[in-house]
Amino acid sequence: MLMIISPAKTLDYTSPLAIQRYTQPQMLAQAETLMQTVRTLTPAQLGSLMKISDKLAGLNAARFTEWQPSFTPENARQAILAFKGDVYTGLQAETFSEQDFDFAQRHLCMLSGLYGVLRPLDLMMPYRLEMGTRLHTPYGNDLYAFWGDSITRQINQQLLQQGDRVVVNLASDEYFKAVRPAALEGELIKPIFMDEKNGSMKVISFYAKKARGMMSRFIIQARLREPEQLKAFDLEGYAFAGETQGRQGRELLFTRRHSAISPAR
């Protein structure tokens, strides 16, 4: 099965690497094309477009200026180790074994506003460009128009390479909107994580993001191959609570009682 997750805004380019091996992004030509447009923007324009502070706008303008497509371990880092956010807190890739990284490389991909689709060991230079950004390019008025169906084609290629036809959607709605479900050459499954709040079950953003990372780690470390095996997910108090047919495919519901959440969380 092929897991799809979102990237993160927070990046880490300083901590020790858990693995030295690396690969190159497969959609680098498109990233170069996109960078030609991004580099025409001033820091003030970036700040307005991305709705970020002057400080962050200046930082990312400098990143875009320094960006060049010859990625090496000296100027880039493996994507799975560079992203640091709630999903990646749950994923804990820094604890992976070599065998875990091997499995992840075949069965996990990260969507990206700049790089399209990244495999775990693909090098990337630091950037910030969210998929929902309304950046005007020759292809249209936003990044969804820029990427068109190319992200879906890349996912289908990875499905073919990894040997089965199951896609596990663990990405946010913003990022999965860049995928065309009807064109996916595989069964689509979406785990949904809900936590108890004020006596009812709700999707709580922080917990749901972390749970998506934990589900990814569960699949990777258990080397899961079959959709039914996902229902055994029980990390940090979650339990399978049922299955429904959503608009785009099967939805697996996992719930957690408030009492199952550690006070340290």
From Swiss-Prot:
Transmembrane segments: none annotated. GO terms for cellular component: cytosol. It comes from the Bacteria. GO terms for biological process: response to hydroperoxide. Belongs to the UPF0246 family. NCBIfam families: PRK02101.1-1 (NF002541), PRK02101.1-3 (NF002542). This is UPF0246 protein NT01EI_0662. It comes from Edwardsiella ictaluri (strain 93-146).
